[in-house]
């Protein structure tokens, strides 16, 4: 097998992933800045299907209307020339100093209003570029000390913001759905809605839960020491797996965003197997980063490697499904003779009595 990515694989990368210049809290950038057009060209060369962006990955936060127009025009032209689409967009609500104590959960109502304004404009930009999924990662929605604000209040503010934005999308007639991305910590000491389970419960408290799903990320669940495949399965069973972020991570560490499958190959295999077994057909987004020691040629190899790893694991999953000894063992351990069929399904008083008497 050639392991060549195809459009039906729906492999995508963020501008911030292949465009990462290698800055970290302890070191300066190690790669030069590449423009969105250059990054689209890079992704076209490696055979990616899609490219995603935060609003300010594409348009600088201080750009004027006159400056913005050619940026958008050049980006759309690059998409066409390189055969890429924009499946997802999102808002940067974490870099600007205004968001240092939260965006939708800031104690300052003016900051919360600014977060809504910025997100509405970013939604417009994303839809204009073709996005059908809009991700919310609350990078500053949290605390270092719970003395600073009540989680009861911040939960209500977060609900109000998402309810407002759902109504905005409906008022505009956009064909867009939201995907909430959990993370346990970083950059805040503790982030609200830390895991997939938290997000699934939160979604059901909103006014339009049918519009909202989740965007689980391998690294984020592994930071909490959880089994990512189980989290993905829970989201799938709830009908909420709208998007997924693929990378790799040592359990219990800071957010490492390693190349997909580079550390936990067994977990990566069972994740790919699950996605392929259930027929997941939404974007497969590699929210990962090349090593800081990499140049841009290595960034290209990194991007190709993410997709190649997925395709290799997909092939291995197919081999497992077709392996007769393995399937015979699975059939043996799940064998059922029908002897308790009368107890299965919806509860009734008769079934309760039968189970007690069995």
Predicted regions and their residues:
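Histidine-acidic metal/acid-base catalytic patches
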Residues: 1-49, 59-61, 66-73, 80, ...
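Structural motif corresponding to the early beta-alpha repeats
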Residues: 8, 17-19, 45-156
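Short beta-strands and strand-loop turn motifs
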Residues: 51-55, 136-138, 180-183, 214-217, ...
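Functionally constrained cores in energy, signaling, and assembly domains
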Residues: 112, 116-118, 183, 215, ...
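Glycine/proline-rich, flexible active-site/cofactor-binding loop segments
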Residues: 126, 134-138, 152-185
């Amino acid at each position: 097998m050639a392991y060549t990515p195809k459009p039906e694989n729906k492999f995508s990368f963020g501008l911030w992933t292949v465009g990462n210049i290698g800055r970290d809290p302890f070191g300066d950038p190690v790669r030069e800045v590449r423009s969105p057009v250059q990054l689209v060209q890079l992704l076209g060369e490696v055979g990616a299907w899609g490219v995603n962006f935060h609003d300010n990955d594409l348009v600088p936060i201080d750009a004027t209307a006159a400056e913005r127009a050619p940026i958008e025009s050049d980006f759309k032209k690059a998409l066409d020339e390189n055969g890429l689409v924009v499946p997802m967009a999102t808002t940067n609500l974490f870099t600007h100093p205004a968001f240092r104590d939260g965006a939708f959960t800031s104690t300052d109502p003016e900051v919360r209003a600014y977060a809504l304004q910025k997100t509405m404009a970013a939604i417009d930009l994303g839809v204009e570029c073709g996005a059908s999924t809009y991700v919310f990662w609350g990078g500053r929605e949290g605390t270092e000390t719970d003395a600073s604000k009540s989680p009861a209040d911040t939960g209500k503010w977060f609900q109000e913001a998402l309810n407002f934005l759902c109504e905005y999308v409906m008022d505009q007639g956009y064909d867009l759905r939201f995907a909430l991305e959990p993370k346990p910590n970083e950059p805040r000491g503790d982030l609200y809605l830390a895991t997939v389970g938290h997000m699934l419960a939160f979604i059901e408290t909103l006014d339009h839960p049918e519009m909202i799903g989740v965007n689980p990320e391998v690294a984020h669940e592994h930071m909490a020491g959880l089994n990512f495949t189980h989290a993905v399965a829970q989201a799938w069973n709830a009908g909420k797996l709208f998007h997924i972020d693929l990378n790799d991570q040592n359990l219990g560490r800071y957010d490492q965003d390693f190349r997909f499958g580079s550390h936990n190959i067994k977990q990566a295999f069972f994740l790919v197997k699950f996605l392929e077994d259930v027929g997941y057909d939404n974007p497969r987004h590699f929210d990962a980063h090349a090593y800081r020691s990499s140049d841009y040629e290595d960034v290209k190899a990194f991007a190709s490697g993410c997709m190649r790893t997925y395709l290799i694991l997909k092939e291995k999953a197919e081999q497992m499904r077709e392996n007769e000894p393995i399937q015979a063992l699975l059939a043996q351990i799940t064998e059922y003779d029908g002897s308790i069929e009368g107890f299965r399904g919806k509860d009734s008083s008769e079934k309760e009595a039968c189970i007690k008497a069995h």
